[in-house]
Amino acid sequence: MAILYIALPTFKESEGYDRADLDLTKQQIALIKIVALAQPNTVVVLNNGAPVAMSAWIEDVAAVLEAWMMGQAGGVAIADILFGRVNPCGKLPETFPLKLADTPAYLNWPGEAGAVRYGEGLFIGYRYYDAKEVPVLFPFGYGLSYTSFAYSNAKVSASSFKDVDGVVVTVEVTNTGSMAGKEIVQVYVHDRKSGLVRPPKELKGFAKVELQPGETKTVSIPLDFRAFAFYHPEHKQWITESGEFDLLIGASSTDIRQAVAVTLESTLRLPCILDKESTLREWLADPHGKIVFGPTFAQIEAQTRQAFGGGESGTESAIGLDFWDMLLDMPLASALMFLQAGLLMHYEDMANNLLSQVHSLE
């Protein structure tokens, strides 16, 4: 076996400046390929502070050990892992992309005129790769072991619960290999329907369990209010929304082994933030807005369908586009002005009347 210790030089990575690429040096890549050609059982030990690209050489080597930035006992730890005295159980704290162009900030960095726009917003790390369905080299939360683990019998303490009560996820984990080891169980939360744009799933809990060969243990991971909450810029606070969520239990962000559906009841009573510039879709999605505007919208819908020939899809076929999507995405005042001919009062008076009614319900 050949062991290659590959560390990024200071001109490639250091504090005080940003990396220009994800690559090892050309000399390091050439060394890996030459050694691996002569000795297929080559192990590459990486000493780096952030992900590196490996597509040029990873298929040529037998294994890669990510050592990150080690302390003075790092050498002993590496030896223990390579010689099997310790079973590795670490999981990646970030995604390893296939190439630089796949990364979330690629189009915005290094910026222009001395300014960088952080345009990725919430979609950083695995959240971005999940949403874009971008293939990666190694996903967030990934890590190998000298043994294997099976997940089964995932349960929750309650299938329906209030946000202030939270919920506890339990899953049975079995060591199906021949060596003692530790597994890090990860729980991701997927919101089936949100009032704001959210990533497909987010890590909200994890736990490490140590198992002997053939042993099974039940792992419990509690999820509290914040596990289901998101920051709402209009309300200027963390909020929850009532609805259905999927609790995804897995060994990494892409290796989901079990899933449980739950229903959350939000206990928050938020002030109404609807105004004339809120879209019809926002009015109908708001609990107070739906009460006030729902009957008016139903009347508008019936009159419009009749005007365009009736039927469930009459408007779409008559004017050749999804009329309702267009209408629902219009601000209240603009939509009422557009529909003025079918209204019983001036659109501005109706908008003011609706606003008065909706805020009286708070």
Q: How would you name each of these model-derived features?
A:
Residues 1-362:
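C-terminal non-catalytic regions of proteins with extracellular/luminal or membrane-system context
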